[in-house]
UniProtKB/Swiss-Prot annotation:
Listed Low complexity bias regions: 15-31
Membrane topology, from the record: Peripheral membrane protein
Subcellular location: Endoplasmic reticulum membrane; Cytoplasm, Cytosol; Cell membrane; Cell projection, Filopodium tip
Modification after translation: Phosphorylation is enhanced in vitro by phorbol-12-myristate-13-acetate (PMA), forskolin and calcium ionophore A23187. Phosphorylation seems to be stimulated in conditions of low cell-cell (or cell-matrix) adhesion.
Gene symbol of the encoding locus: Osbpl3
Key word Nucleus present: yes
Organism: Mus musculus (Mouse)
Protein name (database record): Oxysterol-binding protein-related protein 3
Annotated ranges, domain PH: 50-145
Length: 855
């Protein structure tokens, strides 16, 4: 015990880059920051089993709950279990279980907080007294090193979470927790496919056979699970023998049971010896106290039976799941490579004929509507009483009428990617590409070529008649690019841990990162990406019912997150103070511009105008690194006005989290609640909940929303996945309000960019003369990264950052405060456009201004 006290917290919790001989001022500042607790390194070993630590701690409630609650914790052999009380721990009625050896542990001495970051959750713990804090940190450190040494010595035990020589060492709750984590990790590899070799699609994609043929990890997993299955069958026989022995000891003649001569200690059953040959009933020695030994031995048998049965059934279930999944994938590969049977060809021909006839009918309807719209003033406003389904099926002939099968709500949310039989609204030409199932992929290709090209042209023509008239000078483009000049760099050689280990719990927006970790877009351009589906606002501006308008505004707010699904592997450039960006899109009918209005704190403001809507927001992000994951917390409000009805909508943003920062396949999720209000009309409001993924569930990226009327009654319900599609209605009758555009070819090589994102940094000679020199497209480090010149991009990035620091120092020395050029601060501290950007652009006014040197 004295040895443990000598391992002082201040000596052992120092970050690897810090010296233990720091002066007192540095020690004081260290107490105010998060520090990582080091584990075993190199050839270090730790074989001494630490004592069990128990007691009450404060644990932060899991999202969405807030505050702290009191829980009883038990730390034994590197496993931290917790429940409401000690009695619940003893009864194995656990609330959770953490493998400390596999977690990243960080502490903050000033607030007496301990954070344990696993792959699935971040556990925030707090200790009331400093003495208890030091004691728990010391014990956690010892148990963590002991557990890491055990993992290093017996790596197989990490997968199965119990030792072959002592099954009773694993509590049932412990195994269930880890077993579910392992099953979850397998499901997540299918649920979060960005950039992963495990991603696949059913439609002749060659990635499917490649994944099956090169899946060494799955082969190893199958072999390991088969070994476990055989071993657990042997354990089952052992349990039956023990059960017989238990009934024997429970008989009245318990004192007559004999044991072998050399036996002098308590009975110990070895799980690797199922025949119980160490017991000999032929000797004449008996227990000195038979009833007491019988009671203790019976209790041990009951505990062992309870744990072993849970282990057996859990692993058998996992084994069956993996076997079934692999068989499905093998069948998929066989179907993918084998010729289609004649019956299938006949069915596909019928489907093709039906699709062509339907598309021809739709094309004729759209032509008539387009011809009528040219003869009329602004489109006639439908009657207010029409509901959303009637509007979608009637408005401009855009509905593809397919009846949704009468399935349960659960079956819909299980796989929305296969939910193509719903009644759907064509919001963009690319939306229809997903209307036919993957098995009919070649039918989709043919029908697209024959009719959907004409259909999309009609839709574009109709949009232009309704959209604003934009200046044509410098905006004519032949064709937008479909790829970047060079693919993204290989970042496997970048050591994120060496960069982030000293920044646990800190705001990462102030931490310099290597240019390889960036994508060739910056935050201002990311704000413009939120307008990729601006047609939802165009649609809302033509709907008379405020309740139905709210549905499309909510869908627009959700669609802003769709492009992030494939973008977890890189981060955007941070804009420098005074940097600007513009995006004029005639095809979408809006004009967008943005400016970095503040550097400390970093605030980006943007504004967009259209004949149908006005969009603006100012936002800043706080990034928190927690060891294995990073949270991105946005601060700011998004505004949209619809002049046709005098609506002014505003809403907040939700929290984003990138998982597996240091190792494994990174994936992103969004969670929290968006509250959408109409400031000029209180007849309705909307709440959209981004559901946090649970490691025991395969459902991820789901949203649920409700539109309420003035009395609080739910009028419309929204559901779907934020990266796929949004539906309005119930399980038996729903309307597809929005569907994400398909990804461009080769998107994995180009940072996971959508087609819209690929075009954001594009610059042609005509638009070059219209842009101010502060526009992001002139930024050299970002342009060099896009072109694949990593070394020169890093040099330019450091030069630009140094130049910004010098500008800030000069401003501070002269007492000058930076004044944004195109935005002003309103009375509620929000940044809004001052109306000068678009006016200056008309008359080439940017060339007449003095601009700061940003790069």
């Amino acid at each position: 015990m004295s040895d443990e006290k000598n391992l002082g917290v201040s000596q052992k919790l120092v970050s690897p880059s810090r010296s233990t001989s720091s002066c007192s001022s540095k020690q004081g500042s260290r107490q105010d920051s998060w520090e990582v607790v080091e584990g075993l390194r190199g050839e270090m070993t730790y074989t001494q089993e630490p004592p069990v630590q128990k007691g009450f701690l404060l644990k932060k409630r899991k999202w969405p709950l807030k505050g702290w609650h009191k829980r009883f914790f038990c730390l034994e052999k590197g496993i931290l279990k917790y429940a409401k009380s000690q009695a619940d721990i003893e009864r194995e009625k656990l609330h959770g279980c953490i493998d400390v050896g596999l977690s990243v542990m960080s502490v903050k001495k000033s607030s007496k907080c301990i954070d344990l970051d696993t792959e699935e959750h971040i556990y925030h713990l707090k200790v009331k007294s400093e003495e208890l804090f030091d004691e728990w940190v010391s014990k956690l450190r010892h148990h963590r090193m002991y557990r890491q040494n055990e993992i290093a010595m017996f790596p197989r035990d990490v997968n199965h979470f119990f030792s072959g020589s002592s099954v009773t060492d694993s509590a049932p709750g412990v195994f269930e927790s880890v077993s579910s984590r392992k099953r979850s990790s397998l499901s997540k590899q299918n649920s979060f496919p960005p950039g992963s070799n495990l991603s696949f699609s059913c439609g002749g994609d060659t990635r499917v056979p490649f994944w099956l043929q090169s899946s060494e990890d799955m082969e190893k997993c199958s072999k390991d699970m088969a070994h476990c299955h055989a071993y657990l069958l042997e354990m089952s026989q052992l349990l039956e023998s023990m059960d017989v022995l238990h009934r024997t000891y429970s008989a009245p003649a318990i004192n007559a049971i004999q044991v072998p001569k050399p036996f002098s200690g308590p009975v110990r059953l070895h799980s690797s010896n199922p025949n119980l040959s160490t017991l000999d009933f032929g000797e004449e020695k008996s227990y000195s106290d038979g009833s007491e030994a019988s009671s203790e031995f019976s209790k041990m048998q009951e505990d062992l039976c309870h744990v072993a049965h849970k282990v057996y059934f859990a692993l058998r279930s996992a084994f069956n799941s993996i076997s079934v999944e692999r068989e499905k994938l093998k069948q998929l590969m066989e179907l993918d490579t084998s010729p289609s049977p004649s019956a299938q060809v006949v069915g596909l021909k019928h489907a093709l004929s039906s699709a062509l006839a339907q598309n021809t009918d739709l094309k004729e309807r759209l032509r008539r509507i387009h011809a009528e719209s040219l003869l009329l003033d602004p489109p006639a406003v439908p009657k207010p009483g029409d509901n959303l389904a009637e509007e979608n099926s009637r408005d401009e002939g855009r509905a593809l009428v397919h009846q949704l099968s009468n399935e349960s709500r659960l079956s819909i949310t299980d796989s929305l990617s296969e939910f193509f039989d719903a009644q759907e609204v064509l919001l963009s030409p690319s939306s229809s590409e997903n209307e036919i199932s993957d098995d009919d992929s070649y039918v989709s290709d043919i029908s697209d070529n024959l009719s959907l090209d004409n259909l999309s042209n009609d839709l574009d023509n109709e949009r232009q008649t309704l959209g604003p008239v934009l200046e044509s000078s410098g905006e004519a483009r032949s064709k937008r690019r479909t790829s970047l000049p060079a693919p993204g760099p290989n970042t496997s050689s970048v050591s994120l841990w060496s960069i982030l280990r000293n920044n646990i719990g800190k705001d990462l927006s102030k931490v310099a990162m290597p240019v390889e970790l960036n994508e060739p877009l910056n935050t201002l351009q990311r704000l413009c990406e939120e307008l990729e589906y601006s047609e939802l606002l165009d649609k809302a501006s033509r709907i008379p019912s405020p309740l139905e308008r709210m549905v499309y505004v909510a869908a627009f707010a959700i669609s802003a997150y769709a492009s992030s699904y494939f973008r977890a592997g890189s981060k955007p450039f941070n804009p420098v103070l005074g940097e600007t960006y513009e995006c004029i899109r005639q095809d979408k009918g809006f004009q967008f511009f943005a400016e970095q209005v503040s550097h400390h704190p970093p605030i980006s403001a943007c504004h967009a105008e259209s004949g149908n809507f006005v969009f603006w927001q100012d936002v800043r992000w706080k990034n928190k690194f927690w060891g294995k994951s990073m949270e991105i917390v946005p601060i700011g409000t998004t505004h949209v006005t619809l002049p046709a009805f005098g609506d002014h909508f505003e809403w907040n943003k939700v929290t984003s989290c990138i998982h597996n920062i240091l190792s494994g396949q990174r994936w992103i999720e969004h969670y929290g609640e968006i509250d959408i209000k109409n400031l000029n009309d209180d007849s309705c409001h909307c709440k959209v909940n981004f559901i946090k993924a649970k490691y025991w569930s395969t459902n991820a990226h789901e949203i649920e929303g409700t539109v309420f009327d003035r009395s609080g009654k739910a009028v419309h319900r929204l559901f779907g996945k934020w990266h796929e599609s949004i539906y309005c209605g119930g399980a038996s009758s729903s309307t597809c309000v929005w569907r994400a555009n398909p990804m461009p070819k080769g998107y994995e090589q180009y940072y996971g960019f959508t087609q819209f994102a690929l075009e954001l940094n594009e610059m042609d000679p005509l638009s070059r003369s219209l842009l101010p020199p502060t526009d992001t497209r002139f930024r050299p480090d970002q342009r060099l990264l896009e072109e694949g010149n990593i070394e020169e991009a890093e040099v330019q990035k450091q030069r630009i950052e140094k130049l910004q620091r010098e500008r800030r120092r000069v401003l501070e020395e002269n007492g000058v405060e930076h004044q944004p050029r195109f935005f002003r601060k309103s009375s509620d501290d929000a940044w809004v456009s001052n109306g000068t950007y678009l006016e200056l652009r008309k008359d080439l006014g940017f060339s007449k201004l003095d601009h700061p040197v940003l790069w």
